[in-house]
Design a protein with these regions (language model features):
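Catalytic-domain carbohydrate-binding cleft regions of carbohydrate-active enzymes
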Residues: 1-383, 390, 415-419, 438-450, ...
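Short acidic, Pro/Gly- and aromatic-enriched capping/linker segments at domain boundaries
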Residues: 2-7, 162, 235, 426-443, ...
Length: 520
C-alpha cells in the first residue's frame, strides 16, 4: 500500500517487447505472442496490483485467430484494468520512411481494432524500438488524440536531449509530452529489480519517472521472480512511490512538471538501415503510392455510382502496407527469410490494388466519345486534388503491322490542341512499326479522367535525331537544365540545374572507398 507522504514516484510499466518478425519468421512470432500473453494473463490473475501493458494490433489479431479462449481472458483483464492496451497502433513502424498518411493509417487500423474488441482508446503512443522519429509525427499524434509519446531509440549518445522528459513540438506548433525510456524496453530474467535500482541511482532527484520491464525481444514478459523482487523493493523503499502502472498514468503525473521544449527530429540511429535492403524500400514505396492512388480512384468511381466500394479488399491491402512498414522489415535488417516473405506480402497487396485500380479505371471511362479514324484515345486519371503538369508515358498497338516501309508518327492532342510529343523505343523488340511508345507533356485536371487523342500520320521514314557537335561539345538544354558532353572523352563536363552546377571536376571517376560490412 502506498504511503501518502511519498512525493516522488517511479511508474513500473510491465511489457514484453515482441517483434512479429526479425531473426524469426511470423509463424514463430505468433507462437511467441501466444506463449507470452498466456503467461502474462496467468500472472495478472495471480498477482494483485500487476498491470501488463502491450501494444500492436497485429499481435492481438493472432491471439484472436489462433487461441480465442486466451483472447477472451485478455478482454476480461482489460475490463478489470489489469491489462492495459498500450500505444494502440497496428504495429511499431519505422518512423522516418513512411509518408504522413501511412502513419495516420497505422493509427487508424489500431484504433479501430482496439475500440471494437476492447472498447479502449490509448492516449500515449509508443514506439520503443523504431530507429528514429520524424518531427512530422507530432502533429499527427496530437490530431489523432494522443497527448504523449514514449520511445527508446535513438540513444543518448546519438541524440542529445536537454532532458529525457520533454515537450515535443511539431512543425505546426502541435505539442505532446515525450520521454526517452531508461535502459531500453525490457529487462533480462531476474534483472527487473537491478534495472530499477540502477535507474534510482542514476536519477536520484527524479520526481516522476517511468521504467519499462519484462523479458523482451522474443517476448517473455513478467516472471514470478521479477515480480517478487520488485514487490520487495517497493516495500523497502521509503523515499519513492514505486508502483505498477501504465504510460497514461505516468504522463498524467509528468504533465505537472516544467519541461523543456524540443523542436527537432529524434534522430539519428542505425543510419545504415536507411540505405540497406533497397528492394524492400523500393517495393514498399511502390505499394504505398499504388494504395493511395487506387483508393482515390475507387472513391471517385464509388461517389459517382459507377462501382461498389471494395472495403474488405482495400483493408487487406492496407494491412499488407502497414506490415511492410514494420521497423525490422522496412529498414531491411531482418533475416533473408523475412525479407522474402515481406516482399511476398507486398506483392500480395500490389496484386489486389492492380485489380481494384483496373476496375475503377474502366468504371471511370464510361461514356467516352468513340475515337475517330486514325486516332488512339489515351485516358489518364489524376488522383490528386490539384492540377499537375507532367510527362505522360504510354504504349499502344496500331490496328495492324505497318509493312509498307513508312513510319507512323504520333502527335497527342488535348481538346484539339497539339502537345509536345516524342515517339520512343517501345518495350517490344519485334522489328515492325506496330507497337508505339510515346511521351507527351500535359496538364492534368484534378481528381478526374483526362483524355488525350493521339493522331496517327504515315511519314516516309522514321526520323533520325541529329547529333550536333560544336567546339567538340554536345549541348543539351531545357528551361531548367543544361548538360555539356565532351565529344572527345564522352564524359559530362557540366550538369547544371536551375543555375546550380551539380558536378565537380572529379565527378564520374571511379573511386576506391572504405566501407563497413555492418549494415546498421
Amino acid at each position: 500500500m502506498r504511503k501518502a507522504h511519498k512525493k516522488r514516484s517511479i511508474h513500473l510499466v510491465c511489457n514484453a517487447h515482441l517483434d512479429p518478425v526479425w531473426q524469426w519468421e511470423w509463424e514463430e512470432g505468433a507462437a511467441a505472442a501466444i506463449s507470452t500473453f498466456r503467461t502474462a494473463a496467468d500472472l495478472c490473475e495471480e498477482y494483485p496490483g500487476l498491470i501488463f501493458n502491450h501494444n500492436e494490433a497485429i499481435l492481438y489479431q493472432w491471439i484472436e485467430d489462433y487461441e480465442p479462449s486466451l483472447f477472451q481472458r485478455i478482454q476480461k483483464l482489460v475490463q478489470e484494468k489489469k491489462w492495459q492496451i498500450m500505444g494502440g497502433w497496428y504495429l511499431q513502424p519505422d518512423c522516418n520512411m513512411p509518408c504522413g498518411e501511412s502513419f495516420v493509417r497505422q493509427i487508424l487500423l489500431g484504433r479501430r481494432y482496439f475500440r471494437e474488441k476492447f472498447g479502449v482508446m490509448p492516449t500515449t503512443a509508443i514506439n520503443f524500438d523504431s530507429f528514429g522519429h520524424t518531427r512530422g509525427l507530432v502533429q499527427i499524434l496530437a490530431k489523432s488524440g494522443y497527448d504523449s509519446y514514449l520511445f527508446w531509440r535513438p540513444f543518448p549518445e546519438d541524440c542529445v536531449l536537454e532532458k529525457e522528459e520533454f515537450i515535443w513540438e511539431g512543425y505546426d506548433g502541435s505539442r505532446v509530452l515525450a520521454t526517452r525510456a531508461y535502459g531500453g524496453y525490457s529487462s533480462a530474467y531476474g534483472w527487473a529489480r537491478l534495472k530499477t535500482e540502477a535507474f534510482m541511482k542514476q536519477r536520484p532527484d527524479i520526481v516522476c519517472g517511468v521504467l519499462l520491464w519484462g523479458i523482451g525481444n522474443h517476448g517473455g514478459g513478467p516472471s514470478r521472480v521479477d515480480l517478487e523482487n520488485l514487490n520487495q523493493l517497493t516495500r523497502e523503499t521509503e523515499v519513492l512511490d514505486i508502483r505498477h502502472s501504465t504510460p497514461e498514468a505516468y504522463f498524467k503525473e509528468l504533465k505537472q512538471q516544467d519541461l523543456p521544449v524540443h523542436k527537432k527530429d529524434l534522430n539519428p540511429w542505425g543510419v545504415g538501415c536507411y540505405t540497406s535492403g533497397v528492394k524492400i524500400k523500393q517495393t514498399h514505396r511502390r505499394l504505398e503510392n499504388e494504395f493511395y492512388a487506387a483508393e482515390k480512384m475507387i472513391a471517385s468511381a464509388w461517389c459517382q455510382g459507377m462501382m461498389a466500394y471494395p472495403e474488405a479488399q482495400l483493408q487487406e491491402a492496407l494491412k499488407d502496407l502497414a506490415t511492410s512498414q514494420f521497423h525490422d522489415i522496412l529498414p531491411g535488417e531482418s533475416i533473408q527469410e523475412v525479407i522474402e516473405s515481406s516482399l511476398q506480402i507486398m506483392d500480395h497487396g500490389l496484386e489486389i490494388l492492380s485489380r481494384l485500380k483496373a476496375k475503377a479505371f474502366f468504371s471511370l471511362t464510361q461514356g467516352q466519345t468513340p475515337a475517330r479514324e486514325n486516332e488512339i484515345p489515351i485516358l489518364v486519371y489524376n488522383p490528386h486534388p490539384f492540377a499537375i503538369e507532367t510527362d505522360v508515358v504510354c504504349e499502344f498497338q496500331l490496328a495492324d503491322m505497318n509493312l509498307s516501309g513508312t513510319f507512323t508518327q504520333v502527335t497527342a492532342y488535348q481538346e484539339g490542341q497539339p502537345l509536345p510529343t516524342q515517339v520512343e523505343k517501345e518495350s517490344s523488340n519485334i522489328p515492325f512499326d506496330w507497337r508505339k511508345r510515346i511521351v507527351f507533356n500535359a496538364k492534368l485536371a484534378p481528381s478526374q479522367m483526362n483524355r488525350f487523342d493521339c493522331r496517327l500520320e504515315a511519314i516516309p521514314q522514321k526520323p533520325k535525331p541529329e547529333l550536333k557537335v560544336k567546339d567538340k561539345r554536345i549541348v543539351v538544354k531545357s528551361t531548367d537544365m543544361e548538360v555539356i558532353i565532351n565529344a572527345a572523352t564522352g564524359l559530362i563536363d557540366r550538369y547544371r540545374v536551375r543555375g546550380v552546377d551539380c558536378l565537380s571536376k572529379s565527378a564520374c571517376h571511379p573511386l576506391v572507398m572504405f566501407d563497413s560490412e555492418d549494415p546498421w
